[in-house]
Amino acid sequence: MIWKRHMTLEALNATSVGTMVEHLGIVYTRLGDDLLEATMPVDTRTHQPFGLLHGGASAALAETLGSMAGYLTTRDGQCVVGTEISASHHRAVSQGQVRGVCQPLHLGRQSQCWEIVIYDEQGRRCCTSRLSTAILG
């Protein structure tokens, strides 16, 4: 297990209250030994003007997952900040919900790199994102 902080899904979701994460409807759904998952609705909150999932919403889901996963790997007195994010969009989604799965590519003492893959309800890859973070403290 890679996590140094121990939080329940309920506690993880409580951190979203009053934030953009809550506004977008992002909900943490699974905390595995080396992965963190969340869902996000594809609706008017996350659509672009043509009725498809906005690429920025996908990036927000990816950064939410990567940042929280990074935080969970740190000790008291440390925090994680994002330094770079990329997102490759593979497939359009117009309704339902998407599921993001975040796993580490690199866990160093001062930096981390996370891969976040976003799937549609049929399990098809819609977006592949990579988030780099720095550990402070």
Swiss-Prot record:
Disulfide bond annotation, renumbered to this chain: none
Pfam families cross-referenced by the UniProt entry: 4HBT
UniProt GO MF annotations: 1,4-dihydroxy-2-naphthoyl-CoA thioesterase activity
Top-level taxon: Bacteria
Active site per UniProt: 63
EC number per UniProt: 3.1.2.-
GO cellular component assignments: cytosol
Pathway(s) the chain acts in: Siderophore biosynthesis; enterobactin biosynthesis
Keyword line: Cytoplasm, Hydrolase
UniProt cross-references to InterPro entries, sorted A to Z: HotDog_dom_sf (IPR029069), PAAI_dom (IPR003736), Thioesterase_EntH (IPR026576), Thioestr_dom (IPR006683)
GO biological process, one term: enterobactin biosynthetic process
Subcellular location(s) per record: Cytoplasm
Enzyme class: hydrolase
UniProt keyword annotation of Cytoplasm present: yes
Subunit structure: Homotetramer. Dimer of dimers. Interacts specifically with the aryl carrier protein (ArCP) domain of EntB.
Family: Belongs to the thioesterase PaaI family.
Functional summary from the UniProt entry: Required for optimal enterobactin synthesis. Acts as a proofreading enzyme that prevents EntB misacylation by hydrolyzing the thioester bound existing between EntB and wrongly charged molecules.
Record-given protein name: Proofreading thioesterase EntH
Source organism of the structure: Cronobacter sakazakii (strain ATCC BAA-894)
